[in-house]
Amino acid sequence: MTNRLIALVCAVSFTLLPALTLASSTTLGKVLKQGKLNCGVSTGLAGFSDIDAKGQWQGLDVDYCQALAAAIFGDKNKVEYIPLTARERFAALQSGQIDVLSRNTTWTFERDTTMGLNFVGVNFYDGQGFMVSKKSAIKQVSQLHNKPICVQAETTTKLNLDDYFVSRGLNYQPVVFDTAVQISRAFNSGRCVAITADRSGLYALRINLAKPESAVILSDIISKEPLGPVVREGDDGWFNIARWTLAVMINAEELGITSANLDQHRNSNNPEITRLIGVETNLGQSLGLSNDWAYQIIKQVGNYEESYQRNVGEQSPLMIPRGLNALWSSGGIMYASPIR
């Protein structure tokens, strides 16, 4: 009897296994019902999430929002961008106000383990730096002892700054603001001698200064800042969609697939390529998406390199070198799990 019961339980379990594996995401259902993706972004950070002269959102983090919408709806424009300060961002995600947070956010132990959040991956490897005016003649961080430093509230930046100065017996005068715009104004007016932020953020802040050429970014880097999108814990289906959307963009670059040449690869003899773009595969089903989900991401948004270069790289005013964000095969550490 016991053996028959065990056999019955096993049979039922295996019968249900596909259903459990393909269980619909509650967040995906919500997103489909509302007909758009609610994506949390910054209040304005050039290169990552900012509004252009035509009133359109643009940036590396915005591209991720659009890639996710393209995967879900087949339309990258079905996104509502919700600007959030660093102080507001996690509460907005936890409460369900937004479906995903794509806002230059550092992946840390505490955030990942105590706040009900899941980090999707890394879309920009960064580090904390400092920007000063050229006329200050400051060349290194130690020269900022007892000086006023502008920093954004509720960020790892402030915590790193405290740790760095305490560990070296240095002091500083914190000048704390909620937004990047406020920090730029304070620096322009001379309220602080230096700004500290992720180096990518410093590049963005510098181009928005009244005289960008008057500021210099120091070579000192005091932290690791892996930045990436975030979703709520408790919805593995949605987490999978969010994670593999980023992986598609990175893998597409590695395979040499761009938005421009994508259709030429439909008849490729490379199974990695045909698998990625959905030729004769059903990978989308396991995510609750159509089988051309990856095709739509690449066609409408592009691969990771395309996104990087137009927003923060050589085709942008920021001109940030790829550095660590180059592919692992090109001297960087950018890497995504294989899609197979």
Annotated model-derived regions:
Residues N38-G47, W57-I72, T106, D126-Q182:
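Bilobed "Venus flytrap"/periplasmic-binding protein-like clamshell domains
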Residues Q66, A70, G74, K78-Q143, ...:
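Acidic, polar ligand-binding/catalytic clefts
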Residues V79-A91, P174-S189:
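Short helix-initiation/N-cap motifs at beta->coil->alpha
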Residues A23-S102, L289, Q300, Y304, ...:
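Extracytoplasmic small-molecule ligand-binding "clamshell" domains
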Residues M1-V9:
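Bacterial N-terminal signal peptides that target proteins for export
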